[in-house]
Amino acid sequence: MKTPRLPIALQQAVMRCLREKLAQANLKLGRNYPEPKLVYQQRGTSAGTAWLESYEIRLNPVLMMENQQAFVDEVVPHELAHLLVWKHFGRVAPHGKEWKWMMEAVLGVPARRTHQFELESVRRNTFPYRCQCQQHQLTVRRHNRVVRGEATYRCVKCGEPLVAE
């Protein structure tokens, strides 16, 4: 899949949000944390990821083009919060109480762990699996782990193992 060209205005909106939220956090925390590097190379169904050691935020350009305002309002602060928590508290649970506090009390953004974006444009081949209550779509990676006997997956609703259809 070809990566879309991101409009300059969108990149500027992302950078403006990042800088505003970082300044807000630095003021509230009494710190001077540096600006993280922004990279538009996240792939797959993740909207973004925070890379702690390299202090960078990777954003999915395909999902960003399709959900521009949500990226600015939610995804950028979400990933920034991970980096700030790591700088402020060290290594803690990814979406634990420190992250929730950073999102809500410091950045002023609702703490949601996952996005609700439409994924059709970024979804790769999936394999149908079934439990007792519904059908599931496993990614190629998960399907191959099942085939090799390296993993089994269970339904989060009924708890039953998933079986290939």
Curated annotation (Swiss-Prot):
Cellular component aspect of the GO annotation: cytoplasm
Q: Which residues does Zn(2+) bind?
A: 78, 82
Q: How is the cofactor bound?
A: Binds 1 zinc ion.
The organism sits in which domain of life?
Answer: Bacteria
Swiss-Prot/TrEMBL cofactor(s): Zn(2+)
What GO molecular functions are on record for this protein? zinc ion binding
Where's it mainly located? Answer: cytoplasm
Active-site residue numbers: 79
Entry-linked InterPro entries: SprT-like_domain, SprT_Zn_ribbon, Uncharacterised_SprT
Q: Which residues form the SprT-like domain?
A: 19-163
Which BP terms from GO are recorded? Answer: response to stress
Sequence similarity = Belongs to the SprT family.
Question: HAMAP family recorded for this chain?
Answer: SprT
**Protein name per the record:** Protein SprT
The species this protein belongs to is: Enterobacter sp. (strain 638)
Q: Which gene encodes it?
A: sprT
